[in-house]
Amino acid sequence: MFKDRKEAGERLGRALENYRHCDGIVLAVPRGGIEVGHYVARHLDLPMSVIIVRKLPFPDNPEAGFGAVAEDDSTYFHEKIYDWVPFHKIQDVIERQKDEVKRRAKIFRSGSALPDIAGKTVIVVDD
């Protein structure tokens, strides 16, 4: 599909040309999304920041996920998960991933808060 993340970001930037110089921001999801987002933001002449989200992996199959958590502590998953996985295991997974989100936010943004996105066009980039 793409030779590398640089090419992906440059092509995505061109595809989003209508957003050049808008009142917007590129939010990149680590790790690979940072490189792609860099080239998108550069092409569109927009600021870029990093947003941390984490998959909620099934306790017995960490490659598969049943939801996600974000930096604002929002958690998204289908309630049917309780039919398959005990409540305490789900809560353990959620707490571990929330801790990891906080740890990564400190690393990737050096402790800085997410930028204010109210009223802005937000372009979320992942690889």
What role is predicted for each listed range?
Residues 1-126:
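PRPP-associated nucleotide enzymes
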